[in-house]
Amino acid sequence: MDDNKKKALAAALGQIEKQFGKGSIMKLGDNRTMDVETVSTGSLSLDIALGAGGLPMGRIVEIYGPESSGKTTLTLEVIAQAQKAGKTCAFIDAEHALDPIYAQKLGVDIDQLLCSQPDTGEQALEIVDALARSGAVDLIVVDSVAALTPKAEIEGEMGDSHMGLQARMLSQAMRKLTGNLKQSNCMCIFINQIRMKIGVMFGNPETTTGGNALKFYASVRLDIRRTGAVKDGDEVVGNETRIKVVKNKIAAPFKQAETQILYGKGFNREGELIDLGVKHKLVDKAGAWYSYNGDKIGQGKANASKFMRENPEIGAELDKKLREMLLTPTEDKPEVVEKIEEENEEF
């Protein structure tokens, strides 16, 4: 770039910063634009599937799935993890169905959780926007998009047609919210329900409510499904759950996590640690016995999980090792760099 162009660019940048504030324009490599702060989901498998160790701050996230698949449980787990990190959280309960006792069981500090039960969809989205603009709230959950009913629909008659009203309302809200969330580094999680498209002969007939705007504006979209039951003898004590990362703007998409959601307890973290530890050879399995660092920790997965629960410092150590192994970017791993260099020399 010649000197005249450099001077013109410097003058233009100076004018933009003077008018719109410092940091309104910058080079992509500057500052912390490449580092995305994340909040753990409470599930190690899902954190690894997301590729960044959790859900990204300052972004919109959509979680959808069939009824009773664990959508609200997942968001409550995220709230609990965010609160442990000292963050302020809010729950917009449009479905009027939040159970504070269940939230408390999952580790949510309900005394510190802001909660709103709005009357209309517009009111709910205005509250979300006001909280985002305040800069004091770090995480907002909206449960659910399907329950965000436009004011005109609430005030109208039962049989009235309101074509595209909710989609227009959400589209306008997304345009306003995206910038405000980014500026205040606040994450907004929208829970959504599934509907069926009529007359679809080929392909997936499932779709989410509220139009297409949320699909475009969301940085992460998670599809959560119940795949089976967790049994203790004959008693069903939880759900086998599969969570698929359908869209991911912060890492590679289409990965999936297999986990268990236990009734009244949330994610089976210890079971995940055992499974991932065996898979990545940090936990040894001989027959039904599990060993860690040469010491036997239990016969059968249930006993090994119980040992991890009773010895949280060992669980934390294994968790740390797995995160370092699976969440370090490929280019930062020395053995991978050496292997690539050797391959290049061969060619």
Curated annotation (Swiss-Prot):
It is found in: Cytoplasm. Keywords: ATP-binding, Cytoplasm, DNA damage, DNA recombination, DNA repair, DNA-binding, Nucleotide-binding, SOS response. InterPro entries: AAA+_ATPase (IPR003593), DNA_recomb/repair_RecA (IPR013765), DNA_recomb/repair_RecA_CS (IPR020584), P-loop_NTPase (IPR027417), RecA-like_C (IPR049261), RecA-like_N (IPR049428), RecA_ATP-bd (IPR020588), RecA_C_sf (IPR023400). GO terms for cellular component: cytosol. SMART domains: AAA. One of its GO terms (biological process) is SOS response. CDD domains: RecA. It holds the Pfam family RecA_C. GO terms for molecular function: ATP binding; ATP hydrolysis activity; ATP-dependent DNA damage sensor activity; damaged DNA binding; single-stranded DNA binding. ATP binds at G65, P66, E67, S68, S69, G70, K71, T72. HAMAP family: RecA. Can catalyze the hydrolysis of ATP in the presence of single-stranded DNA, the ATP-dependent uptake of single-stranded DNA by duplex DNA, and the ATP-dependent hybridization of homologous single-stranded DNAs. It interacts with LexA causing its activation and leading to its autocatalytic cleavage. Belongs to the RecA family. This is Protein RecA. It comes from Aliivibrio salmonicida (strain LFI1238) (Vibrio salmonicida (strain LFI1238)).
